[in-house]
């Protein structure tokens, strides 16, 4: 005798791993997007009502990596030095690369449409970013410095690194919006491993998913000026633009990266069990064949 899955309600507990590609969906100026990877773990509870409908809630832990790069970039800005004098600084960068590593916890709630071993899930997912680590690598940068009060152009200055070729790295943590709303979709196929032989049903579930962040993401403003400390001098190098993350930075009043969201595409694999065997009545009312 074979029992149809839709003949009775079923509770599923599912746990597994997922991973794939991440992309930052935003308009950029002078900046190149780069596909990167994400991955994580998930734990779900599903209630599958008789016939074809159900609901699923769960908990996910994710890590997203996002990358940007720029080539042959130039900009200028004004700042105030330690003597309260205005400095006009122009700089060029041969290449720059930034990476963002974001850890987050998600709470999805999805409607389930299923037929036999196939299932389609759609619903919202609330995401809480935990940590966002940022790393910036600058290669072959050069500066020129001008003091307008004295009409003095600094052609060579070791403490200011004027007219020098240098490279550097900067790392710190950024703050993202505390709550993000995502739309989570998923398509699965379930392989039955155990069919009530031990009073529970078990599955291996494989699937593909597409998640899109509906909340515009931008990093919280950081310090307006950071100092690069040179190894053999006590003076610092004021690099406001170089030490500003790309997703915060402006060039002549225009943001390099517009506020945007992430989207993920990937695959998942899970082990699931239905811990409660259907009541006896289910065997008499289900659609079945055989003896």
Tell what function each PLM region has:
Residues 25, 43-51, 113-117, 187-197, ...:
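Outer-membrane beta-barrel proteins
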Residues 25-34, 64-102, 129-180, 216-264:
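Extracellular/periplasm-exposed beta-strand and loop segments of Gram-negative cell-envelope proteins
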Residues 19-25, 61-65, 115, 126-132, ...:
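Transmembrane beta-strands of outer-membrane beta-barrel pores
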Residues 8-48, 270-276, 289-291:
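Short glycine/proline- and aromatic-enriched beta-strand/turn motifs that initiate or cap beta-hairpins
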